[in-house]
């Protein structure tokens, strides 16, 4: 995939539906009684893996061009899988569905692609085992493939060593099949889509500080869900609008959940001109984002804000390379166990373009403001890396090519078309 320099990006754009919310809508709709209608569903490869897994467990799911009908069968309505459950590249599918499968009355196996088979699953296996679950890594390396022998579980309180919405969600979902109140405490609050949506479906989930708790055996009932635009997908257009000279972009109906809005706060710290319009704070908060070209400067990103922007750090790193001054990103060791080691991959590729960047154990230091040139970028099949460097390619001197650039289909199949449409 080759990217060329552009100026004057203008127009309106509705980014795809939020990936985290799309996953959960299908999962919880499958466990609810009745038909759940989901509009603006993200039809990326990861979310389609979730649909595939629940279809294999007997759930009828209709897909009508982004409108999904999930004919749920209730909390105990899943059937023995017709085949091994293939999660593809999706960590969310793997970790959340494991919590559900642990409480079923059947045996299941999860597999996935090479990338997911290298990502850490001990972080969910540990709490599930303490609930009495029978879950094992088939290769004995605490990774996928996993074998889960479902049975009733015992309630626990789990102190999670990491702020991870996937770990928290896994434990809460398993807690629905337990014998009492199950709770999870995190060191820092992670995204809370599971808590919001489970309550919407009828579960009893309470949150206090960084602790979330769920009562067992909830009766979940079908709902209608409109998925907001994914702020992680909007991030690339926010960055492009800020960096590309002469630009003004309106991004419609973007999710601005406070557990996900760290990117907006960092952009403001860097001097960004971003205006929130049509703000709606009911349920999952949303707003239209008006983004104008800005002169950015370096900042420090670390501490409690990290879980609210962990997926946006590759894009922030690119922004920092074009901003004046030094940006320090720290407390982000989680980047090392994403689809790629995003610390090393961002440092390697930005260095190829002439950026002054030093990787650290938990982040990176970027001395910005140097002119960057085109290069051959290796995405390592990481969709967020590919999209971040596509934005960089709009600004650098000379063409930039992205090896494995098609991996954007994981979360944003029409990404390149949308990007160039704004430059027409």
Enumerate the language-model features and the residues they cover.
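Structural preference for solvent-exposed beta-strand-turn elements
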Residues: 1-424
């Amino acid at each position: 995939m080759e990217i060329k320099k552009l100026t004057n990006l203008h127009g309106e754009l509705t980014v795809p539906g939020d990936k985290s919310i799309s996953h959960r809508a299908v999962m919880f709709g499958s466990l609810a009684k009745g038909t759940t209608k989901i509009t603006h569903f993200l039809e990326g490869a990861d979310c389609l893996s979730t649909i595939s897994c629940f279809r294999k467990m007997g759930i009828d799911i209709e897909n009508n061009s982004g409108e999904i009908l999930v004919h749920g069968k209730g909390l105990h309505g899943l059937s023995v899988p017709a085949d091994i459950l293939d999660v593809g590249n999706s960590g969310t599918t793997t970790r959340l569905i494991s919590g559900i499968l642990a409480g079923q009355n059947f045996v299941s196996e999860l597999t996935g692609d090479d990338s997911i088979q290298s990502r850490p699953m001990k972080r969910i296996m540990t709490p599930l085992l303490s609930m009495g679950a029978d879950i094992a890594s088939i290769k004995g390396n605490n990774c996928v493939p996993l074998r889960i022998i479902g049975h009733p579980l015992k309630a626990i309180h789990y102190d999670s060593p990491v702020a991870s919405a996937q770990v928290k969600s896994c434990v809460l979902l398993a807690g629905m099949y337990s014998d009492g109140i199950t709770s999870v405490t995190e060191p820092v609050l992670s995204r809370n889509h599971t808590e919001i949506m489970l309550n919407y479906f009828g579960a009893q989930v309470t949150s206090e500080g960084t602790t979330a708790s769920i009562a067992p055996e909830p009766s979940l009932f079908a709902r209608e869900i409109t998925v907001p635009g994914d702020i992680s997908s909007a991030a690339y257009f926010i960055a492009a609008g800020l960096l590309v000279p002469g630009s003004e972009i309106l991004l419609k109906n973007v999710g601005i959940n406070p557990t996900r809005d760290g990117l907006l706060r960092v952009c403001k710290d860097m001097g960004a001109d971003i205006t929130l319009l049509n703000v709606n704070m009911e349920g999952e908060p949303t707003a239209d984002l008006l983004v104008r070209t800005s002169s950015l400067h370096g900042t420090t990103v670390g501490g409690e804000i990290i879980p609210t922007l962990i997926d946006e750090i590759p894009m922030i790193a690119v922004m920092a390379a074009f901003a004046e001054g030094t940006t320090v990103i720290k407390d982000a060791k989680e980047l090392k166990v994403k689809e790629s080691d995003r610390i090393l991959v961002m440092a390697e590729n930005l260095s190829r373009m002439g950026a002054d960047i030093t990787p650290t154990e938990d982040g990176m230091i970027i001395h910005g403001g140097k002119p960057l040139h085109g290069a051959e970028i290796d995405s390592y099949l990481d969709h967020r890396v590919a999209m971040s460097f596509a934005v960089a390619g709009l600004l650098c001197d000379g063409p930039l090519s992205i090896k494995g650039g098609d991996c954007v289909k994981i979360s944003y199949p029409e990404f390149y078309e949308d990007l160039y449409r704004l430059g027409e």
